[in-house]
UniProtKB/Swiss-Prot annotation:
Species of provenance: Oryza sativa subsp. japonica (Rice)
GO terms for MF: L-methionine-(S)-S-oxide reductase activity; peptide-methionine (S)-S-oxide reductase activity
EC numbers, comma separated: 1.8.4.11
Phylogenetic classification of the source organism: Eukaryota, Viridiplantae, Streptophyta, Embryophyta, Tracheophyta
GO biological process: cellular response to oxidative stress
Any Pfam family hit: PMSR
Family from the record: Belongs to the MsrA Met sulfoxide reductase family.
The protein's name: Peptide methionine sulfoxide reductase A2-1
């Protein structure tokens, strides 16, 4: 195994090499607790063309929800966002990320506990990395507690089971752009 390519022996550790879902679109990955409400928040954002929920940053190839919830895969529940940077700059995605969750609770959001619920920004480019680190430094000034958000290169993305995709929208909550209805998470 080459040190420069950890994904050579384990595909889960390699970079997310998927292409965005359209010309002019870019990808971003965020972990902010249960992916259902995070996904709906990004679905409503003008400039976001597509969202997907799934698993990233772990070591098991092709994990399932059950595997991830078992805690042994190292994966986080993430939302992968396909966005138009001209209509929705990456910094706007970061603002939504910080507003959506408590970045000071380690491996927990509300009643959801486990490493899969950790806070993370997973970048695709050096520009995204810089913006993420700069935004974390600014947000830390607003919190008394230490922010525990990890900022790492985006590793391979594994889509969650179809059941989880657009879960809250399929349950009747609006995904219309700019919708401000409260998001209710339920399972």
């Amino acid at each position: 195994m080459s040190d420069s390519n950890p994904g050579a022996a384990n595909p889960a550790l390699g970079p997310d090499a998927d292409a965005a879902a359209g010309e002019g679109l870019e990808l971003a990955q965020f972990a902010a607790g249960c992916f259902w409400s995070v996904e709906l928040t990004y679905q409503r954002l003008p400039g976001v063309a597509r969202t997907e929920v799934g698993y990233s940053q772990g070591h098991r190839h092709e994990p399932t929800y059950r595997d991830v919830c078992g805690g042994g895969t190292g994966h986080a529940e993430v939302v992968r966002v396909h966005y138009d940077p001209k209509a929705c700059p990456y910094e706007v995605l970061l603002d939504v990320f910080w507003a959506k969750h408590n970045p000071t609770t380690l491996n927990r959001q509300g009643n959801d506990v486990g490493t899969q619920y950790r806070s993370g920004i997973y970048y695709y480019t050096a520009e995204q990395e810089k913006a993420a680190r700069d935004s974390l430094a600014e947000k830390q000034k607003e919190w008394k507690e230490r922010i525990v958000t990890e900022i790492l290169p985006a590793t391979r993305f594994y889509p969650a089971e179809e059941y989880h995709q657009r879960y809250l929208e399929k349950g009747g909550q609006s995904a219309k752009k700019s919708c401000n209805d409260p998001i209710r998470c339920y399972g």
